């Protein structure tokens, strides 16, 4: 069975993002899977585990590769991706050591795009190789770290694009797109027009319906 992971640390993302991702994966991945979130938050209906590292921001993803975390075939999605198509094509990538999309920006921060990752589990090289805080101070982010660590020794995942580069100016969804990654602004829930808005409407509804304690969304998101 495949484990699908996300990471929710800090306060950047509303808890509704976890539920929206969980449901999008459920609707678009036909193989048996378990959805898990690395977080310290209470998220009713979501299987959670405490972060194995105390790193903040994108560095928290290093914890995915700690021993006893991902022990079998694994997929990972950033919370701010929007799933637009079937995900079954990603399953074979979980049988290899590591796979991710190529970085479409290539802005000098590495050629790996870590918004979607697949690996076989029990692969600890990033965790074992990361030197905190030295690496976090000299490198721009986890993508640059993975690029430095792996070079070209990884498989490229197709079907993942940038909302800014591949979606925002298009009048319809690109036929190749399965996952849209958001970076910078807007965040997915801030997209209220165009074809992308149909994929973000549920997320917006959950955010607007959430009570001050943040957990009314659980009653409508556990199905």
Question: Where are the regions that the model predicts?
Answer:
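N-terminal anchoring/stem segment of glycosyltransferases
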Residues: 1-57, 70, 184-187, 204
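Short, well-ordered coil/turn elements that cap or connect secondary structure elements
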Residues: 30-32, 43, 93-94, 151, ...
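Residues that flank catalytic or metal-binding motifs in active/ligand-binding sites
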Residues: 31, 61, 112-115, 142, ...
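Catalytic core and acceptor-binding pocket of nucleotide-sugar-dependent glycosyltransferases
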Residues: 121-223
């Amino acid at each position: 069975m495949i484990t699908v992971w996300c990471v929710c640390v800090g306060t950047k993302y509303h808890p509704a993002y976890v539920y929206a991702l969980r449901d999008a994966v459920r609707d678009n991945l036909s193989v048996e899977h378990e959805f898990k979130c690395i977080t310290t938050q209470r998220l009713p209906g979501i299987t959670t585990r405490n972060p194995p590292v105390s790193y903040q921001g994108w560095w928290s993803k290093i914890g995915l590769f700690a021993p006893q975390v991902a022990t079998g075939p694994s997929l990972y999605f950033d919370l701010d991706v929007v799933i637009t198509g079937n995900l079954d094509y990603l399953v074979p990538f979980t049988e290899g050591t590591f796979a991710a999309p190529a970085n479409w920006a290539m802005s000098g921060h590495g050629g790996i795009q870590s918004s979607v990752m697949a690996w076989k589990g029990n692969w600890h090289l990033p965790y074992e190789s990361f030197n905190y805080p030295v690496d976090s101070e000299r490198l721009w982010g986890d993508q640059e770290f993975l690029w430095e660590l792996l070079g070209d020794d990884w498989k490229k995942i197709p079907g993942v694009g940038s909302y800014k580069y591949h979606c925002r100016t298009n009048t319809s969804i690109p036929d190749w797109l399965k996952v849209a990654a958001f970076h910078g602004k807007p965040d997915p829930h801030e997209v209220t027009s165009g074809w992308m808005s149909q994929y973000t409407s549920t997320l917006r509804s959950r955010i607007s319906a959430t009570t001050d304690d943040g957990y009314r969304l659980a009653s409508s998101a556990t199905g």
